[in-house]
Amino acid sequence: MKKQEQKNKTVFHAVAALLAVLAVVLVLYGGGRWLEKRAEKPETRTQLPQADQETVEVDGVTYRKKSRLTAILVMGVDHDTQDSYEYRKAGQADFLRLVVLDDADKTVQQLQIDRDTMTPVTVLGLLGDRYEPVTQQICLGYAFGDGRQTSCEVTVEAVENLLGGQTIDQYLAMGLDGISTLNDLAGGVTVTLEDDFSAIDPAMTKGTTLTLQGEQAETYVRSRCSVGVGTNEARMARQESYIKQLSVQLDEKLQKDQNFAVDAYDALQPYLTTSMAKGQLVNEAWAAKDYTRLDTIKPDGTYQVGEDGFMEFYPDADALQQAVLQLFYEKVE
C-alpha cells in the first residue's frame, strides 16, 4: 500500500509538467483512413531490456532499473469528443509521447513516438474479442477500442510492446476538439510564420508575426500537405517550437496561481480520457513546478512507404535501446 501511495504521489506531483505536455496533443494529423490489417514484417530491433530485468549489461556497462519512476502515455486523438464511436472509427492516436517522471531525481523526461512506428498492436473484434497482435502503425490501435478507456489501454499495450515490456502506469488522451481551449488557456501563443497558411486562414501569411487564437492554433499545428514542403518532418519541427512556447506560458500561469490547475482541468475535461483522478491531481499540482525537464528523446529511424501506400517508420535498433536505458535505467557505479 505504501509503495502504491508513493507512486500515486509521483504522478500527482508532476501535473504541471503534464499540463505543459498537453500541448503536444495538438500534433494531430487529419486522416480517417481505412484500418486494414497489415501483414507481419520482420522486426530488426536490438534486444531491448525487458521490464522484469532489474539489471542489464550493454556494451560492457551494467545498468540498474530505476525504482521511483512513473510513466505516463499522453495521446492526441484525431476525433471529436462524443459519447460513443462506431467500430474502427474511434480515431487514431496521431500523437504519442511517453512522459517518465523520476521522483528520486525530481526530473521529467519525454520520449517522442512517431505515429507511423511499426510495432505489434493488439486487434479487437467487433464484440471486443482480442486477436493476436499485428505489426502495424502504432497509431492504429486506438481505433479498435471504444474511443475512451479501451482504446487507451490498447495503445498503452502497443507502446509497452515497442519498449520491450516496460510498464506504463497512467495514460491521458485528448481529442482534437480541445485544441482551441488549450491554446486559449495559455493566452494564445505568438509565432512568426515561416510557411504560408493563407489558403486556410487569410490572416496567416508567410512572415507574419501574430498571436494564435482558437482555431488558428489548430491550423498552425495540424496543417501539412498544403503548407511548405508538405512533409510530416517539417510539421513536427513547427509543432515542437510551438509546444515549447506553450509550455512556458502554461508554467507561468501555474507558478502565479495554483488554481490554474483546477481551471485548466475543468476546461479540458470534456475532451480528456485519463486514468488519473482530478482531485488528487489538483491537490498536488503546486509541487510540480520544481521538477526539472530533461531534453526530449527522439529516436532516429527509417521511413518507407508500405505495400498499402501508407508511411511506415522503423526506429533504429540501437537508438531505441538507448532510449529505454535512458528512461528506465541508471548506470551501476
Go through each PLM region and give its residues.
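Non-catalytic, solvent-exposed segments at the cell envelope interface
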Residues: K2, N8-L19, V25-E333
